[in-house]
């Protein structure tokens, strides 16, 4: 399998992580495109037999950090007319409310915790792979994940009130 095939295989995971990280489909697609361009340009640096998924997520993380630094230096506006992608089948109302609550809770996490929760929980990376992507010790990844999960749990349990009230 060539590097191009490996990148294509991991595109859905890269897009999912970018969308969860940025919460803006257009910016997420731009991040994925930049990541793929960088990976293709640096393919000579990839060591065959190593973990391509971790390599790609590391590139994405670095591109994201660089873009965030640039955005801090220049004022950036967000378009108001961002259309959400609709799923193939609409979720039940209860599922939609759960997803909304989870997305809102994820937004309240500090960036470091949200990144770890998304990489481990959503993308299924191991602690070691996540540590490599974020350039952090495995112990730091584990503590950020534990704190992030605990905060998510507290936020979601705080939303334990019913979404609909009975009207008399």
Predicted regions and their residues:
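A short, charge-rich alpha-helical start-of-domain segment used by transcription regulators
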Residues: 1-16, 26-29
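Conserved RNAP core-binding helix
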Residues: 25-42, 125
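Sigma70-family region 2
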Residues: 34-51, 70-71
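Arg/Lys-rich amphipathic alpha helix in sigma70-family domain 2
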Residues: 45-47, 58-78, 95
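Short hydrophobic short-linear motifs embedded
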Residues: 80, 161-168
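Acidic, proline/glycine-rich intrinsically disordered inter-domain spacer in sigma factors
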Residues: 82-107
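A short pre-motif secondary-structure segment
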Residues: 116-120
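DNA-recognition helix of helix-turn-helix
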Residues: 134-158
């Amino acid at each position: 399998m060539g590097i191009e095939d490996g990148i294509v295989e991991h595109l859905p995971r890269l897009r999912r992580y970018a969308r969860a990280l940025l919460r803006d489909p257009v910016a997420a697609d731009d991040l994925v495109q930049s990541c793929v361009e960088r990976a293709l340009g640096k393919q000579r640096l990839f060591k065959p037999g190593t973990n391509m998924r971790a390599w790609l997520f590391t590139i994405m993380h670095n591109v994201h950090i660089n873009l965030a630094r640039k955005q801090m230096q220049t004022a950036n506006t967000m378009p108001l007319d961002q259309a959400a992608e609709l799923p193939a089948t609409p979720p039940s109302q209860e599922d939609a409310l759960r997803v909304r609550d989870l997305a809102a809770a994820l937004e309240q996490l500090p960036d470091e915790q949200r990144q770890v929760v998304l990489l481990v929980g959503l993308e299924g990376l191991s602690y070691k792979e996540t540590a490599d992507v974020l350039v952090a010790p495995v112990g730091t990844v584990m503590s950020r994940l534990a704190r992030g999960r605990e905060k998510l749990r507290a936020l979601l349990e705080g939303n334990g009130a019913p979404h609909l009230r009975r009207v008399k």
